[in-house]
Design a protein with these regions (language model features):
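Active-site environment of divalent metal-dependent phosphoester hydrolases
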Residues: 25-27, 55-59, 83-85, 139-141, ...
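Structured beta-strand-rich core segments of catalytic domains in phosphoester-bond hydrolases
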Residues: 2-12, 29, 47, 51-136, ...
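Alpha-helical scaffold elements lining the catalytic groove of polysaccharide deacetylases
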Residues: 142-155
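N-terminal membrane-anchoring alpha-helices
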Residues: 1-10, 27-30, 34-41, 289-291, ...
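Short, solvent-exposed loop/turn elements at domain surfaces
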Residues: 25-29, 102, 208-212
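Active-site beta-strand/loop signature of hydrolases that rely on acidic residues for catalysis
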Residues: 15-22, 36-60, 93, 120, ...
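Glycine-rich, phosphate-binding/catalytic loops in enzymes
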Residues: 34-36, 64-68, 110, 148-150, ...
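Metal-dependent phosphoester-hydrolase catalytic domains
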Residues: 1-5, 158-166, 174-298
Length: 298
């Protein structure tokens, strides 16, 4: 895979995070993986979360391992389900060393494939921080199941709580006004519990849709029964500290433009668009004033 592209170096007090549902080996997956690796080379992320990562012995090398090798990164992978002679799961990649890592199985129905949350301790230049990724049930009528799943995801985050901000990324298969996402955003109660995470996109673009499942992406048509133009992929950050750690400074879509091959074929990196967010990790003097806040809901 080529290492091309350029992007401004991340601000010295920030870390840059990216999430993408990789869509396994669907479509021209080898060309898509090239596109993913090239784009990542250009945006210089510190940590990447991938969902629908495939590994099939004898035919598909672990896709996260291929991307990590192309970038010289570290990575961890956890399978969530087995099918087609191989495994599918989640991965976390980073230019920093990855220490302890584990996963937890999420509640899921018999008709659904396995669901997990993968957690990894990333040893950054600012110290250790825990990063989590997940991929929730995809059927639109499974909102109740996704509610159960986000409750467990929050339990996992709380179990790994330390002094640094934590980030939860992935394909939540739920829109911002769903109860499961509103709960994560601190706007409703589930099972008598409350939580609050910053929705990175909403913190920066409260009035923009940020669709990651878009009618502009022709790969989406393979799952034509799922409504298009929805924001399903998120980067959530634990609350901003008084010293400004955890402040979201940037959020934008990624992998939302196609590459045109020699024969005129347009390929996207995936059937989903990705999300990029930049989060502050270096402390500032609290006397500098309170961090910026969003006036938006979830």
């Amino acid at each position: 895979m080529r290492r091309t592209g350029a992007y401004q170096v991340v601000k010295p007090r920030h870390l840059r995070f990216v999430t993408l549902n990789l869509w396994g080996e669907n479509g021209p997956w080898e060309a898509r993986l090239e596109l993913v690796a090239d784009k990542l080379a250009g945006v210089l992320p510190d940590v990447v979360a991938l969902q629908e990562v495939r590994e099939v012995p004898g035919s598909v090398t672990n896709q996260a391992a291929l991307i990590a090798k192309a970038r010289g990164w570290n990575h961890v992978f956890a399978p969530s389900t087995a099918w087609g002679g191989g495994q599918e799961g989640l991965a976390i990649l980073s230019k920093f060393p990855i220490g302890a890592h584990d996963f937890r199985v999420l509640p899921h129905s018999q008709e659904d494939e396995g669901r997990i949350v993968l957690s990894a301790r990333v040893d950054t230049e600012f110290g250790e921080t825990w990063v989590h990724t997940t991929h929730l049930s995809f059927r639109e009528h499974e909102g109740r199941k996704r509610e159960d799943q986000v409750l467990v995801v929050d339990e996992v985050v709380q179990a790994h709580k330390n002094d640094a901000p934590q980030v939860v990324m992935g394909d939540f298969n739920a829109v911002p006004h769903s109860d499961e996402v509103r709960w994560l955003s601190g706007l409703t109660t589930l099972a008598g519990r409350r939580a609050y995470y910053q929705d990175a996109w909403d913190m920066i673009h409260p009035d923009e849709p940020g669709y990651t499942w878009s009618k502009d992406n022709h790969y989406r048509e393979r799952m034509y029964w799922l409504r298009a133009d929805r924001r399903l992929d998120y980067i959530f950050v634990t609350p901003t500290r008084r010293d400004r750690r955890g402040t979201v400074h940037e959020a934008r879509l990624l992998f939302d433009e196609p590459m045109v091959l020699g024969g005129g074929e347009r390929i996207f990196a995936s059937d989903h668009f990705g999300v990029l967010a930049e989060v502050q990790y270096l402390t500032e003097d609290p006397a500098a004033g309170p961090p910026p806040t969003s006036t938006s809901g979830g």
